[in-house]
Amino acid sequence: MLTINLHGQPETEFSPFDWVTYRQTGRIQSITEGFAYIYFATEEGGILRYHTFQNQFDDPITQAQGLSSNNIRSLHFDRETGTLWVATKHSLDYSYTREGNWTSIPYGNLALPKNVHIRRIGSSPAYVWLDAGASYLKLDRVSGISLGVFTIPDEEKILWSSSRVLAGINIPEDIANYTVTEGWLLNGNQFLDPFGRTIDITSFYQTRFSDIWLGAGDGTLFLGDAQMETFYPFTFGLANSDITTFTKENDFWTAGRSGFTSGGITRFNPEELQFDLFDFEVTINMNDQSIYSSVDTGDEIWFGGEIGILVYKKKEKFWRLIDEAKGLPGGHIITMDHDTSHVWVGTSRGIARIHKDSKRSRLTGIEPFLHESFIYDIEVIEDQVWIGTSSQLYVYHQDQQALYDFRDMGDLSRISHQQDLLKNFWEIYEYKQWVYIASEKGLIAYDKKRGQWSMVFEKAHYSGRKINAMAFSDEYCFLGTNFGFDRIDLNRFFQRNYSYPFLGRVNDLFISDDVLWLGTNKGLTKFQWTKDF
């Protein structure tokens, strides 16, 4: 019996790449060649695609396109049918379009153990073959129906795609002496990276045009030029997949929770699909820590984490750490924003104002009042600093050097019956003449021109879930939660919920024209949101 698994795929009205997710790749596990693309199976990042005629990477194939998993064990392109076959941890997936419309067959339906490891996939003129180590499975190349299990294939002319090699690859002598650019060295069946670390070669493939591809254990890909006798390294993917924050300029700087694999910070150019990784393990002055907030001040990028703030000076290309010795109040740095001369820092234990040049705290007088307060969000709006905490919403007027309870400013008549019930002010967002605040009770707004407060909608519109991020575009409001996100029409209050498994927890949002960017615990996702009407 075949099972079509669409649990990770959006509705059919979406085109395959209306949703795209970028992740940490992990090891390169397998390589195959299609009509126009070289496909790379990765440990964590789905399938990477390199366009052989344009000589560039395109958007990857992940669960956002309908794959059953982002952990790809092996893959194979069947040239006779144009089908891309993919072995994941628990199922065999295939697609005739090689983009979307994926069919997933659990291994149990193929009379294979659920935890079988498919080492490689191949095809003969008539069938598709799976190498499961101790046995070989013959499949119908159109339907994927099992046609038998063999200890040895009953065909000889099987074209196999490359597989992951655990014991090391024996590099052919004619390429063993190739040079490698960008500070890498080829040493037998391993690479030495620019920092002196040994990186295993995990996959080898030679194309029909005699190009040579090597995949490495850290996700780096190497393209070999036979005429130049040179390998060129490529990096595609993020330093980690749990994205809690990203900056919103031309280049996105992404960061998140540190995990078991080496973490870091990524500079990502979405137009060129270029990734520059700053690895905690080897980058000077970078400390391994989870990052929860970021702000681009123009000359610098600030990242707030568990043990302090990492500051990157763009011109000097230099990192430094600001910690409690410079006046931080301690606790995880949850939020940051900046004015002309200072960066305002909110932590799980209070607030601080750090001078941009000296990198030291400059006291305002409000620090004792907010001591041990959980600061959810800070938004600098003109000469005011809006501060959302677990118990209260404050507005600090810098010119007056005075801290106000939000109830002490403006006309409260439209929320008078709810003003004393409001708490947990999670997110603050300025859009046009409005300041929007997401709270446990609902979304409230302050009209800066009229000085008037209003309740936009109550918590029922987002089922009482915690709001982690907000974004606005004309009449549309986007709310990121622990279970995807909601789009709400502020004129008609029509709600659209997006809770696909490949989204997970949405931590950060940004709208750039027709594209909604989402930082989630499953990666950095872009969505062509205006197509969904």
Question: Which positions does each model-derived feature cover?
Answer:
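Carboxylate-rich, polar loop motifs that coordinate divalent cations or form catalytic acidic clusters
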Residues: 1-533
